[in-house]
Amino acid sequence: MAELLKGAPVARALTEELAARCAALCERGVVPSLAIVRVGEREDDLSYERGALKRCEKVGIEARRVLLPADVSQDELLAAIEDINADSAVHGCLLFRPLPAGLDEGAVAAALDPAKDVDSMTPASLLTTLSGRGEGFAPCTAEAVLALLDHYGVELDGAKVAVVGRSLVIGRPVAAMLTARNATVTTCHTHTRDLAAECRAADVVVAAAGRARTIGPDAVREGQTVIDVGINWDEAAGKLFGDVDFDAAEPIVGALTPVPGGVGAVTTAILAKHVIEAVERAVK
């Protein structure tokens, strides 16, 4: 059976450190604050939101929600972003993505003040992540993947890694970050001819396809480390599933993250870390 790479120990250690840094900022009269912008009521967004609110409370970050209907107009959403930009009491902004059809996500991303972009939404932050240059923050989930691997001592230097998914939110950023750590990375996607073979050849698989159970038993082998980034709500089952078929993979692989309880727990801690760092930069 696979070793379960649980996110709680990683998040707990980060939270303790961040709470001390947050308390020091509060003593200086600065209360770290995060604005969470949610459009609609997707279950995966709601799950992330609940986790983010709990993490902020534990660290001492003031979190405020900006809740907009799924049929919000582009102008209304942009106005909400501009309000956040103009509010000096807000140090970071988290916008749940993807946005509903009809909204221009690129225009919204470009409108956010890069200094408040704690999840690599703006072009400037994304450039930092992909190039390794600049001061922008990496996507929280991508950074959480590396934090988990580091915590459990998974060797990346020279390792073969298959990243399943090429979105700008997770896939491409985490591939770039792994490459910067000297891993040999293969990015897989919908046009990959033999996904299972590419995954089996890897030492580490990062599943970020955004589709439940994309990685089945034919795509894994003994000794592998499998990081499941997926958060997929199954209406019929009434629960969350990852991108990996957990029940099929667990008896085979060497180590595996659960969903929930894996990457997601660390992601909220990284989000809090970015908010604290944004404040520390602002008050230097």
Name each model feature, range by range.
Residues 92-156, 213:
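Anion-binding alpha/beta catalytic cores of soluble intermediary-metabolism enzymes, centered on
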Residues 106-126, 230-283:
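Rossmann-fold NAD(P)-binding glycine/threonine-rich loop
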Residues 56-70, 185-187:
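Short beta-strand elements in bilobed, periplasmic/extracellular small-molecule ligand-binding domains
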Residues 38, 94-98, 164:
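Short beta-strand segments
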Residues 76-88:
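Short, well-structured alpha-helical segments in soluble
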Residues 39-53, 136-225, 229, 234-250:
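Glycine-rich phosphate/diphosphate-binding loop of Rossmann-like nucleotide-binding domains
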Residues 1-30:
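Positively charged, low-complexity intrinsically disordered leader regions
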Residues 24-34, 40-58:
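N-terminal glycine-rich anion-binding loops that anchor highly charged ligand groups
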